[in-house]
Amino acid sequence: MEWTDEGIVLGVRRHGESSAIVELLTRAHGRHLGLVRGGAGSRMRPLLQPGNSVSAVWRARLDEHLGTYAVEGLKLRAATLLASSHGVYGVTHLASIARLLPERDPHEEIFGLLEHSLDDFDDIGSAAVHVIHFELAMLAELGFGLALDNCAVTGETTDLIYVSPKSGGAVSRGAGEPWRDRLLRLPPFLRHGETATELTDQDLQDGFRLTGLFLLRHVLEPRGQVHSDARAGFINALTRQQARAAIPAP
């Protein structure tokens, strides 16, 4: 058995004295593990960092075997990602939720979204938007997508500013007003057909609250899991950055 594919490094663990078991999210073969001989050595370590894109050749005698990887670097983002706290927490969190995908099951849209997200991670505000969109996409990919295109009560497609915490459906301003205190806020950058001209700190916090609730309820808790420490670390880094930006210059 042999195939060649692009992959994004999700994680690495040492195996024996010098090898490593590498977990990739590949474009055509899904989340896939393999042994890299010499992967724990100084030459390969910088290549096998979470967030890096590699070209991987996987070989095994039988399809169900772990197999071995021969990898070459395509885009080495890790040094940049790991230079900031939001980058460290962000790539760790994205890898942890990508790991929720079943092994060896192709998810090309998720691969493309992860690749695009990691390529635009320098600014913490942009990174936060990418993380929220990735969490939404993962909910949909795992069968728990939110219905944000029209109002769950009236069917309207405009003025959608709330989300029902029960159904995961959008709710229009008029329909939701009597229950506004019980509803989640739908930030402008997630509203169907709208282009957010400004991104506020509250928008980002509302986005994380929205995706966090449904990820926990539908995906994590049934598996006996909770949100990763990396997710909390990313949100804390975002909050600190927002607080610094709000302090007026002397």
UniProtKB/Swiss-Prot annotation:
Keywords: DNA damage, DNA recombination, DNA repair. GO terms for biological process: DNA recombination; double-strand break repair. InterPro entries: ARFGAP/RecO, DNA_rep/recomb_RecO_N, NA-bd_OB-fold, RecO, RecO_C. Disulfide bonds: none annotated. Pfam families: RecO_C, RecO_N. SUPFAM superfamilies: ArfGap/RecO-like zinc finger, Nucleic acid-binding proteins. GO terms for cellular component: bacterial nucleoid. Belongs to the RecO family. Involved in DNA repair and RecF pathway recombination. This is DNA repair protein RecO. The lineage of its organism: Bacteria, Pseudomonadati, Pseudomonadota, Alphaproteobacteria, Hyphomicrobiales.
